[in-house]
Amino acid sequence: MSISKDDILNAVAEMSVMDVVELITMMEEKFGVSAAAAVAVAAGPAEAAEEKTEFDVILKGIGGNKVAVIKAVRGATGLGLKEAKDLVESAPAALKEGVSKDDAEALKKALEEAGAEVEVK
């Protein structure tokens, strides 16, 4: 007769906490593993995911010099005059999405020099 996984799980569920800790210690010794190592490995990727690598550049407002902002948008995005004008007039609007931090900061600087209000997310 073979013991199923459900039978083992039910038996562990009926044990006290101290008995479960003792069982884990015995399993670690028998199989040469450590339960703490699995926790440390699982925590590693979460820290790496926190570092943001892609940014969105959002045009929040056009300021006083609309023509200069349109020119800056055209230069940065490669849009035609009408498309750039429509984009600028529809502010707040996303200009570029998923760009690197350096590209986002350069675009923000160029647009702010033209008089636009820009946000990098």
Swiss-Prot record:
Assigned GO CC terms: cytosolic large ribosomal subunit
InterPro entries with a match to the protein in the record: Ribosomal_bL12, Ribosomal_bL12_C, Ribosomal_bL12_C/ClpS-like, Ribosomal_bL12_oligo, Ribosomal_bL12_oligo_N_sf
Keyword Ribosomal protein among record annotations: yes
Extent of the signal sequence: none
SUPFAM superfamilies from the UniProt entry: ClpS-like (SSF54736), Ribosomal protein L7/12, oligomerisation (N-terminal) domain (SSF48300)
Name of a matching Pfam family: Ribosomal_L12_N
Gene Ontology MF annotations: mRNA binding; structural constituent of ribosome
Keyword tags: Ribonucleoprotein, Ribosomal protein
GO biological process assignments: translation
Similarity section: Belongs to the bacterial ribosomal protein bL12 family.
Function: Forms part of the ribosomal stalk which helps the ribosome interact with GTP-bound translation factors. Is thus essential for accurate translation.
PANTHER family: 39S RIBOSOMAL PROTEIN L12, LARGE RIBOSOMAL SUBUNIT PROTEIN BL12M
Assembly information from the UniProt record: Homodimer. Part of the ribosomal stalk of the 50S ribosomal subunit. Forms a multimeric L10(L12)X complex, where L10 forms an elongated spine to which 2 to 4 L12 dimers bind in a sequential fashion. Binds GTP-bound translation factors.
Protein name (record): Large ribosomal subunit protein bL12
Organism encoding this protein: Proteus mirabilis (strain HI4320)
